[in-house]
Amino acid sequence: FQAASGNGDSGYGSFSIDAAGNWTYTLDDTNPAVDALNDGDPLSDSFTVYSEDGTPQLITISITGTNDAAIIAGTTSGAVDEDGADAPVTATGSLTASDVDNTANAFQAASGNGDSGYGSFSIDAAGNWTYTLDDTNPAVDALNDGDPLSDSFTVYSEDGTPQLITISITGTNDAAII
């Protein structure tokens, strides 16, 4: 074979071939068309190699897209005070998702209990989340002034990229019952 190197005909990567016919293709993941592929989307690239006598041979490369994880930013923690008269019993935040695979950049709307069971959460498709402390939970109600607990929940972008939200819970002084 005639040793050669260069870019594929579609420009999605580069190739090289040595005189023994061993060839290598390297995909350019930074190419916008390659980076934008959704999971399972196809592309192809090709290049022509030549034998020692000049006979051409077309080599075609099949490229299959994979899921790129979303980049999640925003409020990933919150704080609530147990049973305080002026203290919040909810924490709120907002997240954003940037995902080249899913242009909606949305979240999977969900609601449920926190991982430790001290409260409940909800998130909408726009990434707005709310955590509500359950002041009737025995572990929460038993907190002394300044005692800490934590709860957490996991939310997911449209493509399934997880993001952990952590909630700090602080005990307050409950008035005596007479």
Predicted feature residues:
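Acidic, turn/loop-rich segments in luminal/extracellular domains of secretory-pathway
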Residues: 7-64, 85-86, 95, 114-171
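Extracellular ectodomain surface segments
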Residues: 1-11, 71-117, 177
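Proline-centered linker/hinge motifs at extracellular inter-domain junctions
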Residues: 67-72, 127, 173-177
